[in-house]
């Protein structure tokens, strides 16, 4: 089901293949098809939920979902080994150039939005943080290496050292945080604990009093604390939420994408249309992300 052309296009809800989702959510009958879907760890849980629910919609289509990171998914798309790549960051210019060499046209489909939350140990007294302070913590040349640099006395953290928990560099979350917080031309400080998965970040912060980490809001739990985030010193402090991701009030929110190799057709198009339908968008909302529009879901 892999197609090949040569330019990049952006696809909106109605423009994803040129028609709206079927009102009854039922795709046309086809022979047995397996769609390969790979990429973002942020999206993997909701992608698995979509795949499971879609079995009831069309038993003739199976969706094989794997993670590995946004970069891994996009690389697989460009190599022609997946039908859909999941990404929590935009495709890079160099990836587009490689796509052209491979005769592939990556088409972007925004399937939801995510608030990138900051996670702290539950005993951390820090209730709010600015984007500039996050940069001081994570960026090369940043001035915050100890909690006392932020005016914080951290219980259980005798060293006072800020333990920076981050993601591996094939992660879309890593790339988005670098773009939104560290800024153009900046680099991460050396010495962070770079983990494979979103849940891994939250789990380590939960167990480490000195730690700070970042991950998708959907991975939050009652054992960690999330400070509100201020765009600058004068801005309102906004807690991470699906609503803040939708209206743009939360400073570090991002779109979540699926990429296809060319305009989707057949079973791929029917599946994406269903994801963008109210049923599919209610599923992403139920998983802690923000849908692309207001949808009415069951009680």
Residue spans of the language-model regions?
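Exported/periplasmic ABC-transporter solute-binding proteins
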Residues: 16-114, 119-299
């Amino acid at each position: 089901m892999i197609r090949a052309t040569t330019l990049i296009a952006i696809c909106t809800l109605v423009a994803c293949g040129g028609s709206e989702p079927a009102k009854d959510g039922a795709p046309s009958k086809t022979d047995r098809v397996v769609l390969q879907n790979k990429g973002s760890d942020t999206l993997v849980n909701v992608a698995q939920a979509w795949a499971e629910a879609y079995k009831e919609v069309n038993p003739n289509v199976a969706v094989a979902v794997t993670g590995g990171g946004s970069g891994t998914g996009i690389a697989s798309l460009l190599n022609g080994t997946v039908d859909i790549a999941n990404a929590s960051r935009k495709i890079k210019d160099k990836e587009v150039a490689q796509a052209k060499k491979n005769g592939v046209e990556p088409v972007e489909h925004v399937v939801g939005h995510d608030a990138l939350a900051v996670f702290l140990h539950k005993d951390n007294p820090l209730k709010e943080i600015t984007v500039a302070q996050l940069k001081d913590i994570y960026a090369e040349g940043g001035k915050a290496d100890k909690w006392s640099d932020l005016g914080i006395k951290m219980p259980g953290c005798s060293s006072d050292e800020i333990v920076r928990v981050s993601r591996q560099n094939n992660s879309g979350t890593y790339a988005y945080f670098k773009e939104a917080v560290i800024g153009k031309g900046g680099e991460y400080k050396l010495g962070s604990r770079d983990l494979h998965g979103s849940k891994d970040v939250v789990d380590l912060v939960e167990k480490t009093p000195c730690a700070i980490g970042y991950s998708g809001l959907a991975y939050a739990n009652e054992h960690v604390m999330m400070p509100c985030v201020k765009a600058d010193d004068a801005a309102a402090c906004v807690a991470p939420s699906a609503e803040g991701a939708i209206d743009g009030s939360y400073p570090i929110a991002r779109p979540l994408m699926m990429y296809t190799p060319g305009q989707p057709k057949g079973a791929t198009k029917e599946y994406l249309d269903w994801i963008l339908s109210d049923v599919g968008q209610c599923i992403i909302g139920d998983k802690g992300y923000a849908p692309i529009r207001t949808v009415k879901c069951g009680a």
